[in-house]
């Protein structure tokens, strides 16, 4: 892999099967099936290669691997495979760096709410590395991602960096987008919308603003819709 996929990342993991008697592998990637313009041309002793520097958004990529033997000769190319990289979707960021030497290496993951919902990963310079249209609200210590997946109609759960659903709440069970977590016992917990009813607007610095809109805003009159949430725990297996 990857094979016949549209990726949402410019950091690409390549994997292939081990070849008999190979001591190394030569991997090439190109924007052409003729491989006359190479993104990468590198050797590795492993059957995986992570490329972080060669690709950009909206690239079309053909790639292939061949074994290298102990006498230095090359084997035949393994089947040529193809994938594409999708578009950037995060809103533009302005990153101000005051002292580059104080910035730790690593990536930052966050969710944006405007101008549309999206989550993504950026490097320390603000460059977009990975994105999804899902609403992410929690990452645990092992890097597992939780939130509201864009394909599950407001249901919540766990998904991976390949956009695959690992677990979701049952059909017809939307969640509050602010929080869903997996508990130490393996179960999942989140807030779900429970009831909407009219209630009072409590008095405060905002009172005059609500009164200007026609509300009594006296702390007594039931006139404003309030949403009640229910805290639910789901069994990992039976939901």
Task: Give the role of each language-model region.
Residues 1, 14-16, 27, 51:
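Residue-level signature of extracellular beta-strand-rich folds
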Residues 4-9:
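Short, solvent-exposed loop/linker segments at the N-terminal edge
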């Amino acid at each position: 892999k990857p094979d016949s996929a549209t990726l949402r990342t410019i950091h690409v993991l390549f994997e292939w099967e081990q070849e008999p008697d190979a001591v190394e592998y030569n991997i090439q990637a190109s924007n052409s099936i003729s491989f006359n313009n190479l993104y990468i041309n590198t050797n590795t002793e492993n059957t995986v290669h992570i490329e972080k520097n060669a690709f950009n958004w909206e690239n079309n990529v053909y790639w292939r691997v061949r074994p290298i033997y102990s006498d230095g000769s090359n084997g035949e190319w393994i089947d040529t495979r193809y994938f594409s990289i999708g578009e950037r979707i995060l809103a533009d960021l302005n990153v101000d760096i005051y002292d580059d030497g104080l910035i730790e290496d690593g990536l930052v993951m966050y969710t944006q709410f405007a101008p549309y919902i999206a989550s993504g990963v950026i490097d320390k310079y603000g460059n977009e590395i990975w994105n999804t249209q899902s609403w992410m609200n929690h990452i645990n210590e092992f890097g597992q991602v939780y939130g509201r997946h864009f394909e599950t109609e407001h249901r919540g759960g766990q998904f991976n960096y390949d956009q695959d659903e690992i677990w979701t709440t049952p059909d017809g069970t939307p969640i509050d987008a602010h929080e869903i977590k997996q508990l130490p016992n393996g179960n999942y917990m989140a807030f779900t919308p429970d009831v909407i009813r009219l209630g009072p607007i409590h008095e405060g610095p905002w009172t005059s603003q609500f009164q200007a809109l026609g509300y009594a805003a006296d702390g007594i009159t039931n006139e404003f819709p309030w949403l009640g949430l229910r805290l639910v725990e789901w069994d990992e297996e039976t939901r």
